[in-house]
Amino acid sequence: MQKNLTRWLLTCCIMVVAMIIVGGITRLTDSGLSIVEWRPVTGILPPFSYDTWQAEFAKYKAFPEYNAVNYGMTLSEFKFIYLLEFVHRLLGRATGLIYILPLIYFYFKGIIKNRDILSYIIVLLLFCVQGFMGWYMVKSGLVNHPSVSHFRLAFHLIIAVIIYHLLFYKLVKNCCDILLIPSQINLKLPLIFSVAAIAMIYVQIFLGALVAGLDAGLIYNSFPLMGGNFIPIEIKDNFISFKNWYDPVFVQFMHRLGAYSLSIIVIALIISLLKVKNPKLNKVAFYLSIALLIQLSTGVITLLYHVPIIAASMHQFFAIVLLSVVIWCYSLIKNS
């Protein structure tokens, strides 16, 4: 039965990652405001007939995005953005069901013990918060300025990442072997660096969402400098101000700084793992190197080529991959 628990956790992790990636594509294609109602139960089926499609299109036309951004859009074009948002919402519903139904079964079968149930309930509550946060985010764009709040977008993403983190950590603990390392070997430094790396990845994901929300990837499409300067001229004289977090230039600059900081932390983690001279930790160090390299490369490509959807989606995906490898590393060390 433990194998069934492992398969369930793996399925939930895959579903959450799919939801994150589809959500990212929804943002990149400006599809998020195409469904202007929140119907958690009755909205599980898309329009099928011509009349129902026209009715949904009419609802969309009543909100500012149509007139300000997509005036003259055809029904076929509307169907594309509508179905992307619909798939994103459907994935959210499906993931919730795939989580809660087996959870009830595993608990009453005694596979999930009473001592562990609280953490699973926390994940369930986060799913509920995530659904509300998604609508709260969409609602922010159904106004005169048809653009969702970049802060709400960032929190919507972070909640999804937290859900994934909790599920993946349980998965790793459930199926990975314990590290057999002599007691005289000190793993304190790798543990500290792994915690720091996890924290910095969260910061970077949050900043990345702010970049996406402000379309900040469409400016200063050069690397490593921004307009010939390390610190762009727009923020040199006014660096410490909360208003900067509404400025695409500042947010992009902070995301770049975050990338440099994360790289230093992950490289330090890799070096500390290699010094232990343990085959399993050496394997983790190798995977960390690959994940970091791909993550940095996709980030630079996304910037240089003005945010192509495939590159941006890969960049988001490998942020989750990098987080996963660091969580695996942390779990191995913590539970050794």
From Swiss-Prot:
- Per its UniProt entry, what is the enzyme's top EC class, as one word? oxidoreductase
GO:BP terms for this protein? heme A biosynthetic process
| InterPro entries noted in UniProt | COX15/CtaA_fam (IPR003780), HemeA_Synthase_type2 (IPR023754)
Name the UniProt key words of this record, in alphabetical order: Cell membrane, Heme biosynthesis, Iron, Membrane, Metal-binding, Oxidoreductase, Transmembrane, Transmembrane helix
- UniProt keyword annotation of Oxidoreductase present: yes
Which pathway is it part of?
Answer: Porphyrin-containing compound metabolism; heme A biosynthesis; heme A from heme O: step 1/1
Q: Which GO terms describe its cellular component?
A: plasma membrane
Would the keyword Transmembrane turn up in this protein's UniProt record? yes
**Which GO terms fall under molecular function for this chain's record?**
metal ion binding; oxidoreductase activity, acting on NAD(P)H, heme protein as acceptor
Where heme is bound, by residue? 255, 315
Write out the catalysed reaction: Fe(II)-heme o + 2 A + H2O = Fe(II)-heme a + 2 AH2
Q: What is its EC number?
A: 1.17.99.9
**TM region(s), chain numbering:** 5-25, 92-112, 117-137, 153-173, 191-211, 257-277, 284-304, 307-327
Quote the subcellular location field of this record: Cell membrane
> In UniProt terms, what function does this protein have?
Catalyzes the conversion of heme O to heme A by two successive hydroxylations of the methyl group at C8. The first hydroxylation forms heme I, the second hydroxylation results in an unstable dihydroxymethyl group, which spontaneously dehydrates, resulting in the formyl group of heme A.
The UniProt entry, under HAMAP family, shows: HemeA_synth_type2
| Protein family according to the UniProt entry | Belongs to the COX15/CtaA family. Type 2 subfamily.
Subunit relationships: Interacts with CtaB.
Name the chain's protein. Heme A synthase
Q: Which gene encodes it?
A: ctaA
